[in-house]
Amino acid sequence: MSQDSATTTPPPPLTSDVSMPSGEEDEPKHVTSEEEAPVTSETNLKLPLMPELEESNHTAEVVSEKVTPETMTLESEGLNHAAEDSEQTHEVTPETETAKLEVLNHTAEDSEQTHEVTPEKETVKSEFLNHVAEDSEQTHEVTPETETVKSEVLNHAAEDSEQPRGVTPTPETETSEADTSLLVTSETEEPNHAAEDYSETEPSQKLMLEQRRKYMEVEDWTEPELPDEAVLEAAASVPEPKQPEPQTPPPPPSTTTSTVASRSLAEMMNREEAEVEEKQKIQIPRSLGSFKEETNKISDLSETELNALQELRHLLQVSQDSSKTSIWGVPLLKDDRTDVVLLKFLRARDFKPQEAYSMLNKTLQWRIDFNIEELLDENLGDDLDKVVFMQGQDKENHPVCYNVYGEFQNKDLYQKTFSDEEKRERFLRWRIQFLEKSIRNLDFVAGGVSTICQVNDLKNSPGPGKTELRLATKQALHLLQDNYPEFVSKQIFINVPWWYLAFYRIISPFMSQRSKSKLVFAGPSRSAETLLKYISPEHVPVQYGGLSVDNCECNSDFTHDDIATEITVKPTTKQTVEIIVYEKCTIVWEIRVVGWEVSYGAEFVPENKEGYTVIIQKPRKMTAKNELVVSHSFKVGEVGRILLTVDNPTSTKKMLIYRFKVKPLACE
């Protein structure tokens, strides 16, 4: 078993550099590498594009049909022999000067063809194949050896010839030859299966579509609104998209080298695309894109954004009583913080000044109707203090708000909060009051902190059957979206159950990329790890894997200012932390391993070799049910080292978090 060690010298604690973590599939395109020959004839033929071939698991093979005339006439026996070989009757009608467009329009609906016409002489002869078998595609290549075409060339695709003849079963085709050299690749039109699918949509799927429409304009706030029970059942019952059954086409002739290569490439592309699509189905990203919060500095605004801000200022100046109006403690005019507030409304309306002004006016009127100023001083009790609370800040200094919906598993609390309309209204007022007080702690300074990080704990949260809770959260969500724009820096969902992920899959296609980039999801096994990516351990509550004890009845010698150190303990290894002591003092420390299931021990080793090692904590197995954070203190009477040892016997890595403090001894 390998052993790692970390040496720590007080008084400055060890610090660790923590870095911030940061639809329809495109159809395969057929690319033709042949160069387009220059136009040498006065005749300009416009070839109509044929409808696109229906998509299937195997790519339709595209074969070029090339007819190269050498003389004015072809021997009839050659054509007759060719017709016998393919069991088809082909009529070859020579024309002069121009090709008849009617023949080109007589193309099968489900075919994809490349027509190439190559002139050889000033006088052009057109040949048309008027009758082709319905389920076959014939490639006829005529290679002149002498002034007359030999029948053997049409009968057999010469193996040593540069232009072999191959027969590939695809839809019917027709070719024409004119004075002009043209290469036209037409793609068939894909049938519109979406219309058929919608017409046959089951009621459960219609419920999901209706739920999606509700989220067409998901804004900054994305609190965990509980979906309808019928919607969740629909999400769970929707089967995976059926893949078209593979169809095995008849093997192409071995002599058609270009067709075989094209088919192999197409099959490889289909296989790779299918693998990518399958991965996208089963993967649920924990982070849905990177998002960099705007600084709200005027110098960072584009010219368009700056013009919009100036126009919104002008609209406020010409309006009545704007100079006497304030919001969240910030005057709307003649204040350094005003621009930060106005930019929130502008961003919520895509920098459209008139719409932002309308939204701001509606918000001001709602605040009057809701009696926000009186609400701040209203006593609504402390029953919900464990449901929603502020604690610490993230690594970008945003205050962190925790929403713990599992508290509503308490039946008494649930009934007391949601049993009737009056109690739900009181809950709504309490939620708005809490948010207003939190916003008043923001600085609204350009380049400062004017947003909040939201952590939503969905562990043991009531399911979709709790109608009263769903109605209350939906109403709160609408108020937050309409009247508190751009106040969330990031939404972190932890302990996410399966039903919420199913619900999110329904609404996510209708959310803007900017809104989705603020969302982070983590299941129960990764919740602590995810929080520690965005929030330092000294700010993460102990119940979520950190060291913060703001809302715990714990005796702690540490505050948020005491930086913690994170160390990854590799599987089946032992990690030792050294705290070197140079003087007589008292050392206090906190240590925890996220999830524990390790052995922990502590001892003091004096520098004097004749001294005795003091066992502070005998090695013992720590489980997840033990205390979340282990706190110790030791009075040191001589120079030496305190060794904290963590032995990880498991096959998974563990996160070790610790911090310590040196307290000088009182003068005796």
From Swiss-Prot:
The protein's role, per its UniProt record: Carrier protein that may be involved in membrane-trafficking events associated with cell plate formation during cytokinesis. Binds to some hydrophobic molecules such as phosphoinositides and promotes their transfer between the different cellular sites.
Residue ranges with Basic and acidic residues bias: 55-68, 82-100, 107-125, 132-150
PROSITE patterns: CRAL_TRIO, GOLD
Gene from which this protein is expressed: PATL5
Lineage: Eukaryota, Viridiplantae, Streptophyta, Embryophyta, Tracheophyta
Other remarks on this protein: 'Patella' means 'small plate' in Latin.
Gene Ontology biological process terms in this record: cell division; cellular response to auxin stimulus; protein localization involved in auxin polar transport
Protein name (record): Patellin-5
UniProt xrefs under InterPro entries: CRAL-TRIO_dom, CRAL-TRIO_dom_sf, CRAL/TRIO_N_dom, CRAL/TRIO_N_dom_sf, GOLD_dom, GOLD_dom_sf, PATL, PATL1-6_C_GOLD
Biased composition (Acidic residues): 218-231
Location(s) in or outside the cell: Membrane; Cytoplasm
Biased composition (Pro residues): 244-254
Membrane disposition: Peripheral membrane protein
Record region (Disordered): 1-263
Family annotation (PANTHER family): PATELLIN-1 (PTHR45932), PATELLIN-5 (PTHR45932:SF14)
Coiled coil: none
Pfam families per record: CRAL_TRIO, CRAL_TRIO_N, GOLD_PATL1_C
Organism: Arabidopsis thaliana
Residues with Phosphoserine modification: 290
Ranges of compositional bias, category Polar residues: 170-186
Residues covered by the CRAL-TRIO domain: 377-552
Domain of life: Eukaryota
SMART domains attached to this UniProt entry: CRAL_TRIO_N, SEC14
Family: Belongs to the patellin family.
Domain GOLD per the UniProt entry, residue ranges: 556-662
Record key words, sorted: Cell cycle, Cell division, Cytoplasm, Lipid-binding, Membrane, Phosphoprotein, Transport
